UniProtKB/Swiss-Prot annotation:
It is an enzyme of class 7 (translocase). Transmembrane segments: none annotated. NDH-1 is composed of 14 different subunits. Subunits NuoB, C, D, E, F, and G constitute the peripheral sector of the complex. Residues 1-10 have a biased composition (Basic and acidic residues). Pfam families: Complex1_30kDa. This is NADH-quinone oxidoreductase subunit C. The keyword Nucleotidyltransferase does not apply. It is a peripheral membrane protein. NDH-1 shuttles electrons from NADH, via FMN and iron-sulfur (Fe-S) centers, to quinones in the respiratory chain. The immediate electron acceptor for the enzyme in this species is believed to be a menaquinone. Couples the redox reaction to proton translocation (for every two electrons transferred, four hydrogen ions are translocated across the cytoplasmic membrane), and thus conserves the redox energy in a proton gradient.
């Protein structure tokens, strides 16, 4: 498949296809770092990082982008705003980072936005290739984020949608009626993170047993273990240092 060619606007001025910040496959310049995090996953406990090899990682602060976003990103935003009357209320912020576009959506609006993204002729995001969860423990009240990767095979474009809910009220509308491919992926996100997708046709666990307690990829989920025997020697279960509490 040949590389996409630059287009021109109505005045004949070339408009680059490559989004702003992208540098021919290399990541765009990173935003400023906030104070470094120590340990793993924002552990706020004793500060004992011996189990992680003394890992120290920078924490980046990603701010909302301003116009122009660059390339087709502005076209996508304009088309969605024109096709969806509740655009101003539904879109919490727009982020352009490392040459990728992410639209942060109010949780109750996610299914509506997906419907417009799929059906509008100027958008045509026919495929939801991924639904996944992220736990930003300690970041804010809405720590559970669900990420939707949308692809337009018509226009060869990709956009990411993201919605955030709290651990106390982890409800999101299911998008399975719009994207059937989201069925098992929503089940996995429910299983691992405890996000409840209202309207899903069969929201049951998909990896863990039905009677399993808790959601293993939440960062406040304690590690456990069972004793294992090796050649007559009994190895005790691991400690619970990574309980993230």
């Amino acid at each position: 498949m040949s590389a996409p060619q630059d287009r021109t606007d109505d005045g004949g001025v070339p408009v680059p296809v490559t989004p702003a910040g992208a540098t021919g496959g290399a990541p765009a310049e990173l935003p400023p770092s906030s104070p470094a995090g120590r340990g793993m996953f924002g552990d706020q406990g004793t500060g004992d990082v011996s189990g992680y090899g003394g890992l120290v990682r920078p924490q980046r602060s990603i701010e909302a982008a301003t116009r122009p976003y660059g390339g087709y990103f502005d076209e996508v935003a304009d088309a969605l705003e024109e096709a969806y009357p509740a655009f101003g209320e539904a879109i919490e912020k727009v982020v352009v980072d490392r040459g990728e576009l992410t639209l942060h959506i109010r949780p109750e609006r996610i299914a509506e936005v997906c419907q417009v993204m799929r059906d509008d002729l100027s958008l045509r995001f026919e495929l939801c290739s991924s639904v996944s969860g992220v736990d930003y423990l300690g970041a804010d009240a809405c720590r559970l984020h669900v990420v939707y990767q949308l692809t337009s095979m018509t226009y060869r474009r990709q956009v990411r949608l993201e919605a955030a809910v709290s651990a106390e009220n982890p409800h999101l509308p299911s998008v399975t009626s719009v994207y059937p491919t989201a069925d098992w992926q929503e089940r996995e996100t429910y299983d691992m993170f405890g996000v409840i997708f209202d309207g899903h046709p069969g929201l049951t666990r998909i990896l863990m047993p039905d009677d399993w307690e808790g959601h293993p990829q939440r960062k406040d989920y304690p590690l456990g273990g069972v004793p294992v025997e090796y050649k007559g020697a009994e190895i005790p279960p691991p400690d619970r240092r990574r309980s993230y509490q």
